């Protein structure tokens, strides 16, 4: 089975400092980018629209609820869910492209790197910090 089409969903609130980096990191693998914004009062929405994302405003009811709402907005059956302060490495983009061409599972975890004061935290249980981020929409929630 070939994924072919991939939706990327990003939840935001006042993320003008992060959203461009996040969106730019997924542009070459995403077939659509949807930003679900919790009524930001900064320039998050304007930046996302300028970069080609579809922006949907939705009041924040909780992290999981917002993620699930974002998932439901996706038009394709494969969805990559990100937070606005996250960005994909070239290596991860290449791996996702491979998965798009030949998926072998219904969901994929990714190791999240956590930075504090500009330094990657590699110890104390902070790495690997595996998160389920790439899923078949109809099997997730």
Please place each PLM-identified region on the residue numbering.
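N-proximal low-complexity "stem/linker" segments adjacent to membrane-targeting elements
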Residues: 1-25
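Acidic helix N-cap motif at the loop->helix transition within catalytic regions
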Residues: 20, 42-51, 91-92
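Short, acidic, metal-binding catalytic loop of nucleotide-sugar glycosyltransferases
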Residues: 24-33
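A conserved acidic beta->alpha catalytic loop
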Residues: 25, 37-46, 83
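Conserved donor nucleotide-binding strand/loop of the catalytic core
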Residues: 31, 45-73
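Catalytic metal- and UDP-sugar-binding loop of GT-A-like glycosyltransferases, i.e.
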Residues: 36, 58, 80-84
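Catalytic-site signature of metal-activated, phosphate-bearing donor transferases
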Residues: 68-72, 76-82, 89-141
């Amino acid at each position: 089975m070939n994924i072919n089409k991939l939706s990327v969903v990003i939840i935001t609130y006042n993320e003008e400092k992060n959203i461009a980096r996040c969106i730019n990191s997924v542009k070459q693998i995403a077939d659509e980018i949807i930003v679900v914004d919790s009524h930001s009062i900064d320039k998050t929405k304007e930046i996302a629209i300028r970069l080609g994302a579809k922006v949907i405003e939705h009041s924040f009811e909780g992290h999981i609820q917002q993620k699930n709402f974002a998932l439901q907005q996706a038009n394709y059956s494969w969805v990559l869910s990100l937070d606005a302060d996250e960005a994909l490495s070239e290596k991860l983009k290449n791996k996702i492209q491979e998965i798009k061409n030949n998926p072998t599972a219904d969901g994929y975890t990714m190791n999240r790197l956590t930075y504090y004061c500009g330094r990657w935290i590699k110890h104390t249980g902070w790495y690997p910090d595996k998160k389920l981020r790439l899923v078949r929409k109809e099997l997730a929630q």
